[in-house]
Amino acid sequence: MPVLGSQRRLLGSLNCTPPATFPLMLAPNRTGPQCLEVSIPNGLFLSLGLVSLVENVLVVAAIAKNSNLHSPMYYFICCLAVSDLLVSVSNVLETAVMLLLEAGALAARAAVVQQLDNVIDVLICGSMVSSLCFLGAIAVDRYISIFYALRYHSVVTLPRAWRIIAAIWVASILTSLLFITYYNHTVVLLCLVGFFIAMLALMAVLYVHMLARACQHARGIARLQKRQRPIHRGFGLKGAATLTILLGVFFLCWGPFFLHLSLIVLCPQHPTCGCIFKNFNLFLALIICNAIVDPLIYAFRSQELRKTLQEVLQCSW
């Protein structure tokens, strides 16, 4: 990526320098104190990408195989898996080409590598935007299923779900093209940061409201069964833990990347911000980790999907 990820650009591999020996080191900063820089080896990028690739392919295969999973909720989960799949594919492809260029096993002109780099950047940006959108869509779908349970199937219909999915993909592609074209414009970066904050706020409000409703429902059941404290306390702790994991993973994996974008606008020349910029590869690795964790949170918790996944694995063997 031109501004965001110069450390990961393919063009840099045409005239590369030897990688650092130690994964964690203090990087000198001539205008300020020393910086703590975490170096992510290309092999680790490749390994994380492959794990995410396999995991999300299994989710897509399981949902496609089982007709019982052909519902709006699982279609949103499937599209989230496809988005995470594209994040993994783009990073695996970029890392593989970089390793081949560094080893001298692939001879390519700078113009060809530039075009490939642009294609990969569009894939990465588009898949990131679509991934955030489908996380928000899943949150809205669950909210409607809880607060409007009787009207859910009339509100969230398959045609509407398909239109939402198509709109998200089109918007993601257009956004990625605009981002790559106008990456050096402050407005573009601010729009991306604002989009992340909006998704974070949307998910936090919806899931907190859902947790409050679930706890209220549990209290009502507890009063009927005259066992208010044990049920309410256990359910509340479990719900709070689930909410903390869901929002915590989202914030920890995506937050540093969008902090990086914010600092490019706010303090591009400040020494402290420069220290954060040096860890861009770590922020990309966290996004790939999110692509690994998403199936565990949204897909594999479904008993029906796990059962189908076992059938898919047995057929593959």
Curated annotation (Swiss-Prot):
One Gene Ontology cellular component: plasma membrane
Molecular function in Gene Ontology: melanocyte-stimulating hormone receptor activity
Keywords of the record: Cell membrane, G-protein coupled receptor, Glycoprotein, Lipoprotein, Membrane, Palmitate, Receptor, Transducer, Transmembrane, Transmembrane helix
Domain of life (superkingdom): Eukaryota
Extracellular face residues: 1-37, 94-118, 184-191, 267-279
Keyword Isomerase (UniProt): no
Ranges annotated as spanning the membrane: 38-63, 73-93, 119-140, 164-183, 192-211, 241-266, 280-300
UniProt cross-references to InterPro entries, sorted A to Z: GPCR_Rhodpsn, GPCR_Rhodpsn_7TM, Melcrt_ACTH_rcpt, MSH_rcpt
Bilayer topology annotation: Multi-pass membrane protein
Lipid-binding residues (covalent, S-palmitoyl cysteine): 315
Keyword Secreted: no
SUPFAM superfamilies per record: Family A G protein-coupled receptor-like
Location in or out of the cell: Cell membrane
A Pfam family matched in the record: 7tm_1
SMART domains reported in the protein's UniProt record: 7TM_GPCR_Srsx
Glycosylation site residues: 29
Residue intervals annotated with topology Cytoplasmic: 64-72, 141-163, 212-240, 301-317
Function: Receptor for MSH (alpha, beta and gamma) and ACTH. The activity of this receptor is mediated by G proteins which activate adenylate cyclase. Mediates melanogenesis, the production of eumelanin (black/brown) and phaeomelanin (red/yellow), via regulation of cAMP signaling in melanocytes.
Family: Belongs to the G-protein coupled receptor 1 family.
Subunit structure: Interacts with MGRN1, but does not undergo MGRN1-mediated ubiquitination; this interaction competes with GNAS-binding and thus inhibits agonist-induced cAMP production. Interacts with OPN3; the interaction results in a decrease in MC1R-mediated cAMP signaling and ultimately a decrease in melanin production in melanocytes.
UniProt-recorded name of the protein: Melanocyte-stimulating hormone receptor
Classification lineage: Eukaryota, Metazoa, Chordata, Craniata, Vertebrata
Chain's gene name: MC1R
